[in-house]
Amino acid sequence: MFNNSMQGGLVIRPSNDRDKPFLMNLYNSTRDDLKHVDASHDFIEELIEMQFKAQFEGYGEQFPNAFYFVIERQQEKIGRIAVDFGHNEVRIIDISFIKAAQNKGYGSVVINALKSAAEQNKVPLTLTVLHSNVPAINLYQKLGFKIVDNKLPHALLMWLPESKTARFSVN
């Protein structure tokens, strides 16, 4: 798969049931869109919890062989990533960090580790991102990803290992 000990003191480990409160809080922190709904606080929290469960179940249906990891730094949980190591690609399904760990280069470290895994397996590394998430798109492009499908609301981005660039056409 990929090395679980990375640059910057980051460690990636498989998530487990004890991580559920952290994962729920992390998901909650990414759903500012739902926090502005005109409804009671309890209703919004319940809605976010339902969305969290639906996301996890949806990933399970769409990517039944996916792996779910917690990202730690100095034994503190700072993020999560879901990855599908398929036969024809390595797919980043989801990646997110707590607010205190954002914009510190940790995402680049994790993605570069996945690029190494894709390179070793001679397959592309792919992901989708919302068009509205311009900072993420800019980061991915800086890391060598190209937009290969641009259907709303998501863009499909792909990074190709050196050994694959001649076999794939990327615009």
Residue spans for each PLM region:
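A short, internal acetyl-CoA/4′-phosphopantetheine-binding micro-motif in the GNAT/acyltransferase core
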Residues: 95-103, 129-130
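Conserved acetyl-CoA-binding loop-helix of GNAT-fold acetyltransferases
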Residues: 103-116, 138-142
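Conserved GNAT acetyl-CoA-binding A-motif
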Residues: 119-128
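A detector for short, charged/polar N-terminal pre-domain segments
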Residues: 1-3
